[in-house]
């Protein structure tokens, strides 16, 4: 790494050769956090959201959400969020390109959410995590492949979707195309 940095034409990169064991950019969350892939296939009905502990270093191919709030996990794991990504987010080939700036920061969340409604979303989000734990032998990409998604995970996401949709409307949306 030292030689690589010394061979650069960029003065800041050359300076970093003094500490070859350090990352160029070190912005790590101080608490546990969530991650979302930068690029996801368009075949998925949901974007897989992962939890990382604060001592884990995420790949540059992941978007870091500096929160471990299960309510936020529920919102991000919902079909409503996937529809938002389809409308607002970027595209990459046949899939989605997730951007914290475009997809996460602009996702509309109702201002007034009752305690009961928030608890319901959290409960359903925990149901998604529990359903994922039942299939620990599967990679997350396979869990969210429509052809392989376990029935329990699909059901847990459907229940979460209903809870999230109730935050926005008294009736459930019939057509949620991303």
Task: Walk through the language-model features, giving the residues of each.
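S-adenosyl-L-methionine
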Residues: 1-178
